[in-house]
Amino acid sequence: MEEEAGEEPRLDRPTAPKDFHFYNMDLYDSEDRLPLFPEENTRLRRQTIQAEMTYDPKEVGNSFVDEGRMGVPAYPPYGIKRREPGWEQRDWRLEGEVETEDQDQDFSQWSMAGQSQALWESYRYTHGRASEEYECYVIPEEEDEEEAADLFCVTCRTPIRAVEKDFGEHKEHEVTPLSKALESAKEEIHKNMYKLEQQIIEMENFASHLEEVFITVEENFGRQEQNFESHYNGILETLAQKYEEKIQALGEKKKEKLEALYGQLVSCGENLDTCKELMETIEEMCHEEKVDFLKVSNETLGKFLKTKTDVEIAAQPEFEDQTLDFSDVEQLMGSMNTILAPSAPVINPQAPNSATGSSVRVCWSLYADDTVESYQLSYRPVRDSLPGKEQAEFTVTVKESYCSVTNLEPNTQYEFWVIAQNRAGPSPSSEHAMYMTAPSPPIIKTEAIRSCEEAALICWESGNLNPVDSYTVELTQVEEPAASGVTESVVGIPICESLIQLQPGQSYTICVRALNVGGPSARSTPATVRTTGSYFPLNKATCHPWLTISEDGFTVIRSERKNLTQELQPQQTQFTRCVAIMGNLIPVRGRHYWEIEMDEHLDYTVGVAFEDVPKQEDLGANGFSWCMRHTFASSRHKYEFLHNRTTPDIRITVPPKKIGILLDYENSKLSFFNVDIAQHLYTFSCQLQQFVHPCFSLEKPGCLKIHNGISMPMHATFY
């Protein structure tokens, strides 16, 4: 490095150790970099500012003398060249270069940013053209011959240049682009920072938990201290009571013994007095006549000797061994536990939407001071049973303060209660709480679905023995076969049917849920509804006995019968005179279109009628129906458009094989069309104050097929 020619003298720096790995700090944003040596960085920045001005002192001449008189420090007597990062990097790698301390001090004194800037501005102002000429003599800075590091040696963990990879010591090492290494390092730093943040959060949570444990230890200590004190006070009171009882009994025995001994002592004293008196009497008689003495003394001594003297001690001084009964004390000692029996738990009311059709989640709480080892959760169904017959009870043992009870019956109310247990014993039972399982899923009546371009009427069965609170209908718009997700929900439906507004020309998948206090049921089996046209089923309750309906539900058949003259009993809903059947059209005021396909030689009547049309009359024979009637006789077709037994005089030249019927509530019209040739046949103008339904009648054996749920043809839109 010392042999490089043409290099201007530069400020030498301390030599870095051999194992020092240099990382270019310019790769990082300056604002993200902390100043490691603030004072030195300030000095280097000032050097950089001064280094931008390279000059030759000879060009200035005596200006330095004048500027020195003005108090401005003189420039150093040598040229300054701006330092590139490559120089700084190379200076760190050089070894053996000597830096003089005096040069460093002179350079630091000279490179004051503010003074240098003022000097340069004053120089340009005072010298004018000369300063501009001076700028022309500034020697352009030579590009650093060394390339910046663009690779990163993974083995040495240091930035390198591409040439070092090909020919240097890093030839066999693993290298990667410097930008990629930088991104990897940043990602690793971010990961480590994230881990560190998680550790900090965990340590904070752990510290909070430790604080809670400290508080709990203090509370438990106070509670146990109070418990011990209470038990020991009870034991001491019991012992003191027993002590008093034993001392009192012992004192009574002492008194009894002393009284017996005292009585015996008094008796002994009396006997001694008697003996003394007898001795004195005998001594006196000894001095008297001897004959009398002998008589009296013998008699007196005989009486005295015949008297028995009790010389046995009436009461022994020893006391009997007193056996102390400490059974009750032992019982107290045995009952002195470190914990008390828990208090009665508090069972929580049922949370909304916490149950399924076969399970409920029961929760309860306990006082914080209680210690519990397990819980016994008991339950039984609440039903109307016979008097004297109780429902079976079930018990579950759990460790937690909640339990999910399974294998229950849907839409059924259960009674729950819980008992807490520990070593001291069980707690009292909690209050009883009522929980409800969710209902069973409803069953959609797919054969009874009615729809039009704007709405659909959905009917279903509850599927539950007990009543439910409400129903929810969920709609999913099917745009593609793989589409999923609920588009709309209709909630709070109190009955088992709902009229739902829909978008025309769409297909929907419909499900129904039942709801009660326990939560919603599972979804019902889905049904598909299309709003491409009016779709309605046939009302089997109105079907004449001579008619049958095919399996698809849209073909009406009249077969040959022998007893056709048999009179039928009048019915409220069933046709008995006219061999007819009605359809169930959705009760929506709008435009409804359907078609009937039949043999052109078949006698039939088709049209609309009110629901309460007389069932003992022919269709079109009253003011409750509007119909088109066809009869075929003698190779002639006769068409009548009947209402209240009247018909217009209309001739149809092309017998229709498929008739289209358009019911227009908005314009109060009923139109008939020959579908095959798109021919308009006739239009009724009728005031429909009530909803009407399609009606079909077969005057002779044959069949007709109903096509509904189809789009309205173009020719029908003009009427």
Swiss-Prot record:
Keyword Nucleus set for record: yes
Q: Which domain of life is it from?
A: Eukaryota
Q: List the disulfide bonds.
A: none
Q: Which residues form a coiled coil?
A: 178-290
Listed GO CC annotations: nucleus; perinuclear region of cytoplasm; sarcoplasmic reticulum
Fibronectin type-III domain boundaries: 342-437, 438-531
State the compartments where it is located: Nucleus; Sarcoplasmic reticulum; Cytoplasm, Perinuclear region
Grouped into one coarse class, the protein's main location is nucleus
Checking Gene3D superfamilies in the record gives: 2.60.120.920, Classic Zinc Finger (3.30.160.60), Immunoglobulins (2.60.40.10)
Expressing tissues: Expressed in skeletal and cardiac muscles.
Q: Does the keyword DNA-binding apply?
A: no
Sequence ranges assigned to domain B30.2/SPRY in this UniProt record: 513-711
Question: What keywords appear on the UniProt entry?
Answer: Coiled coil, Cytoplasm, Nucleus, Repeat, Sarcoplasmic reticulum
Pfam entry (one): SPRY
Q: Subunit structure, per the record?
A: Interacts with CMYA5. In cardiac muscles, identified in a complex composed of FSD2, CMYA5 and RYR2.
Classification via PANTHER family: E3 UBIQUITIN-PROTEIN LIGASE TRIM36-RELATED, FIBRONECTIN TYPE III AND SPRY DOMAIN-CONTAINING PROTEIN 2
Q: What is this protein called?
A: Fibronectin type III and SPRY domain-containing protein 2
- Organism annotation: Cavia porcellus (Guinea pig)
